[in-house]
Each structure stands twice: as C-alpha cells, then as structure tokens.
C-alpha cells in the first residue's frame, strides 16, 4: 500500500492537535495508520429514493472497520425530482448535482481522506457523486440505494409516471377523480428510486458498467436484504482497492464510457444519461462528445422491454439477470469492450465469465440480440438550424419518429402545462418550451408534467414537444430536449414564432424550422437577451457559470 494521503493529518508531532480531534470522534493509537475512508451518506426523508440509505451507510461503516479502515461519515444533500416536478423547485434539481459533487469533494479533500464510499438514491445523487469521484481520483466505490418495487392496482404495475399520466387522463375525461386518487395512493409502495428505467436506475447502471459499483448491485430492490449484503461487500472491496491503489481514473477510460453508452441504449435508458455522461467524462478528462451517442446508437439495439415505454420495471430486469446479463449479450455481439476493469481489478470478460450467453427463457424482459425491441438505440442526437450543437430525442415507443407541424410557443413549463390541460394542444402541433435551459431556467427543468399530460390525453404519437430544458427518465413519446444553443444565449430556438413550421425527424437526425438563414438573422437583430431571473442565491450563481448542455451543463469547465 502506498503512503496514505491521511498521513498529512495523522503523522508527526506537529499533528498532535489534529489527532486530538480525531480521538474525540473515536480514533485510538492503532487507528492513525489505517486508511481514513469517507462515507458520503445521502440519507434523507425528503424522498423515498433516499429514505433507506442510512441502514446501508451504517452497514458499510461497520464493514470498513472490520476490513481495516477508519470510516468517517458525512452527509450530502438530495432533492426529490418527483416532488419538485412541475414547480419552481425543479430548477434546483440539476443544480443539486453540482452541490453534491462539490460537497463530497470538499469534505474528502479538506479531511485528507484516502478513499470514499458514496451512497445515493435520487437522480442527481449518482452523477454528482461520480463527478466528485472523478475530480478527486482517490479509491472510490458507489452504493446505490436501490430501486422501488412496483405499486399494484388491480393487477397492474404502477410507477410514479402512472400518477403524472393520470392527471392528463383526468383532464381529457378518460378517468375520474376516484381512479386518480387510487393511482396516487398505490404507485409508490415504499423505499427506493422510481421503478422504471428512469434516470436513477439508468445512472446506477452506468456506474456499474464503469466499474465503480459491484456487479448486479444497480438493479437490486431497496427493501431487499441483498442490498444490505452488497453494501457490506462494497466496503470490503473499497478497503482492498486502497491497498491495491485502484483509482477511478484507472477505470474511467474512453472505452468504459463507450461501454456505458452501449448499455444505456440496450436497456432503453433516460435522456439524462447523455447530459450526465458528458459531465462525468469531462471531469475525468475523457473525450466523449454528443456525437458519440449517435455513433453508438446506430449499432446497438434496444433489447430490454422496460418502462416508461415498455412493460416491465427494474426489479424484473434484476430477476432476469440484471446489467451483467445485458453486458454479456453485448459482449458476445462485440458491442462492448471486455478489457475494461472494475473496482475489484477484474476485467469485464473475467467477471462475466459465468454469466449465461443467453437470457433466461422464462422471462420477457431481456431479449436476444437477434430479436430486439428496436434495431437501433432509442436516444437519437438531432442537429439542424434549431440545434447546431445538437439535442437529444427519445424515440422508444414511438411508431413514427417524424413530425412536421406548426409551432406552439411557450416561454415556461407552467404556461405550456396550463394550455395542455385546457385541451388547447392539437394533433400535429410541435410544442416548444424555451428559456428553460441551463442558463435560462436556470437549472434546465425536466418536462415530465407536460409530456405526461400529452400522453394521458392520447396525443403521445400525434404531438412533438421540443425544449432547451430536460426530460424526466419517465418521459416517452416524440420528445426532444437539451436543444443547444439554448434560447437564453441566443440560440435559434429563441427566434421561432407561433405557427412557424418545424420538422422533427429522428430517422434522419434532423431538427429544423422552415426559415431561411436570412430570415433568422433578421429576427436576431430584434432579439433581446432575457434579463436574469435571479439576482442572488444559488440559481443566480449557477446561471453565471454553467456550460451549454452539449458539454454536460458543467460548472467547472476548463477555460
């Protein structure tokens, strides 16, 4: 084992005052030569995603001690996307990714920790932790709090998206308030992150593929005992990684990020994975750009039938073999690199050796590579005169991913949702929500409320929605987000007007408005940059330093 970083605070007579502080929190003479390991605990009762984390943190803390390390637990924040969705509070969601990253980096570096075990649940916990882990490059492991089990109503599996869609169903007269109330009361049965292949489960899968969490751990249910066992094992592995000096940047390679992109295509993962992978790769110094997603999409099919557009939830994926089973299928097809390593020091080929070549026959969640749900990945990167830097279209569950129609312009999510619920949006419309980007929002809110209302009204196949904001992992339909440049910095989305004809063509990776370059420039002369919405506080600070979404909406971009 190399010299411990923590020796800066534990060794030598000049560090006697430092040691005195450590003695007060439980250190004894023999402990000052052990690795000090941070336990970044995202426990919170704000959200069901994080309310089960403390038992995992305590088990990991105990396991670190038994394995020869000294744990130091500290808290980090979470917000609940599901609770803040559709409100002003959602502007803080993506901001929380940066706060989580900054807080973990700050605590670990201030205290000269030798490693970190991060525990999280809700969407931004995972990329926030990974950004910090990449910045610090000290031995690290991530423990996912686990997925929620599906809610049940009359034999039907429910998720939180069921409740959002029920709102649209109510306003269009498809259900009554009694049914809405039943869905509300039954869709979230306990602890865990939202149960479909939404953002949290997508990002936990990304971390597993990158090798910074244990195989199978990303799809475990929060309330199952195997999750506690996995937390204990993760702590043991981390202590061993410190001894072997296995560091995150040894694992975060271009090939491992490409593997992660391949897997999110195969499982039908969230659009937010594009934003977060770009951000993590940027921090790690790996050259991954938005075009890599389109390149990989062209060759990797969707082989998992998972919600929001499919039939099954993440616990079903786990029971069918989880991410290792998906990876084995992709490995055999030559679609991922088997030489990438994980935190245990094993290559993908090594740790998948005993995984069956084919998925179990008694399930329909994972398909063979020659019988995919979709022949190409579901996250298409579109470009055109509305998005010169690119944007992300999610086309799973859409029979015809091409629509040309008149623009319906909204300057905020609230205005758009109001119009949808008033039944003002008609088949063939292209709904435009702008000034919701990283700078303009600020914070790049997720548009789950309007997209779910559109689906709930039966317009999911008949209306396109485009935005410089984001979408929830629970969104499906013909939706296009992350349009860059965004409206607030003068992107062309700021120049379109009500009724302009817009083409969204995910087949040919095109998004454009039928206006000449001359007309766009004429309109630009009259465009006025929006006045910042916030003068003080975290949103004001964020809007001044955040990058474009095509670079991951990061706040520490090298100048």
UniProtKB/Swiss-Prot annotation:
It catalyses: (2R)-2,3-dihydroxy-3-methylbutanoate = 3-methyl-2-oxobutanoate + H2O; (2R,3R)-2,3-dihydroxy-3-methylpentanoate = (S)-3-methyl-2-oxopentanoate + H2O. GO terms for molecular function: 2 iron, 2 sulfur cluster binding; dihydroxy-acid dehydratase activity; magnesium ion binding. It is an enzyme of class 4 (lyase). Its cofactor is [2Fe-2S] cluster; Mg(2+). The modification N6-carboxylysine is found at residue 124. Mg(2+) binds at residues 81, 123-124, 446. Pathway: Amino-acid biosynthesis; L-isoleucine biosynthesis; L-isoleucine from 2-oxobutanoate: step 3/4; Amino-acid biosynthesis; L-valine biosynthesis; L-valine from pyruvate: step 3/4. The keyword Cytoplasm does not apply. [2Fe-2S] cluster binds at residues 49, 122, 194. PANTHER family: DIHYDROXY-ACID DEHYDRATASE DAD, DIHYDROXY-ACID DEHYDRATASE, MITOCHONDRIAL. Belongs to the IlvD/Edd family. Homodimer. This is Dihydroxy-acid dehydratase.
């Amino acid at each position: 084992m190399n010299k411990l970083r923590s020796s800066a605070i534990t060794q030598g007579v000049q560090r006697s005052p430092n040691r005195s502080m450590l003695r007060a929190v439980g250190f004894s003479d023999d402990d000052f030569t052990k690795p000090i390991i941070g336990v970044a605990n995202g426990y919170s009762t704000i959200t069901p995603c994080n309310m089960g984390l403390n038992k995992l943190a305590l088990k990991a803390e105990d396991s670190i001690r038994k394995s020869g390390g000294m744990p130091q637990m500290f808290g980090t924040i979470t917000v609940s996307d599901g609770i803040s969705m559709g409100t002003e509070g959602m502007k803080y969601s993506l901001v929380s990714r940066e706060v989580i990253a900054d807080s973990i980096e700050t605590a670990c570096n201030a205290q000269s920790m030798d490693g970190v075990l991060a525990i999280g649940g809700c969407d931004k916990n995972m990329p926030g932790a990974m950004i910090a882990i990449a910045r610090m490059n000290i031995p690290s492991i991530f423990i996912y709090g686990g997925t929620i089990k599906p809610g049940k109503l009359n034999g039907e599996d429910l998720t939180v998206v069921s409740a959002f869609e029920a709102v649209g169903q109510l306003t269009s007269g498809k259900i009554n308030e009694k049914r809405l109330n039943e869905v509300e009361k039954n869709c979230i049965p306990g602890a865990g992150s939202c149960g479909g292949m939404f953002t949290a489960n997508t990002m936990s899968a990304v971390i597993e593929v990158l090798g910074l969490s244990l195989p199978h751990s990303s799809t475990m249910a929060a309330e199952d005992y195997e999750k506690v066992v996995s937390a204990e094992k993760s702590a043991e592995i981390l202590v061993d990684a410190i001894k072997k000096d296995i560091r995150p940047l040894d694992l975060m390679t271009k090939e491992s990020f490409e593997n992660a992109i391949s897997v999110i295509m195969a499982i039908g993962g969230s659009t937010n994975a594009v934003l977060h992978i770009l951000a993590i790769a940027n921090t790690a110094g790996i050259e991954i750009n938005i075009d890599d997603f389109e390149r990989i999409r062209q060759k990797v099919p969707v082989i998992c039938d998972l919600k929001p557009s499919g039939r099954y939830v993440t616990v079903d994926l786990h029971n069918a073999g989880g991410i290792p089973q998906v990876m084995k299928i992709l490995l055999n097809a030559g679609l991922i690199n088997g030489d990438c390593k994980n935190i245990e020091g094993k290559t993908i080929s090594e740790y998948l050796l005993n995984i069956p070549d084919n998925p179990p026959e008694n399930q329909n969640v994972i398909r063979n590579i020659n019988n995919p749900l979709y022949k190409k990945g579901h996250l298409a990167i579109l470009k055109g005169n509305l998005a010169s830097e690119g944007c992300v279209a999610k086309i799973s569950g859409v029979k015809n991913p091409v629509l040309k129609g008149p623009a319906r312009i909204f300057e905020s999510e609230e205005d758009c949702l109001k119009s949808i619920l008033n039944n003002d949006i008609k088949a063939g419309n292209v709904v435009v929500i702008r000034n919701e980007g990283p700078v303009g929002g600020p914070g790049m809110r997720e548009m789950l409320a309007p997209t779910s209302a559109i689906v709930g009204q039966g317009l999911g196949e008949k209306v396109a929605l485009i935005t410089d904001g984001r979408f929830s992992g629970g969104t499906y339909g013909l939706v296009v987000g992350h349009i860059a440049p965004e409206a607030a910095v003068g992107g062309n989305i700021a120049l379109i007007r009500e009724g302009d004809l817009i083409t969204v063509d995910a087949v040919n990776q095109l998004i454009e408005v039928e206006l000449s370059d001359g007309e766009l420039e004429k309109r630009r002369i009259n465009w006025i940059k929006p006045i910042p919405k916030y003068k003080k506080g975290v949103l004001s600070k964020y809007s001044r330093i955040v990058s474009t979404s095509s670079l991951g909406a990061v706040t520490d971009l090298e100048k």
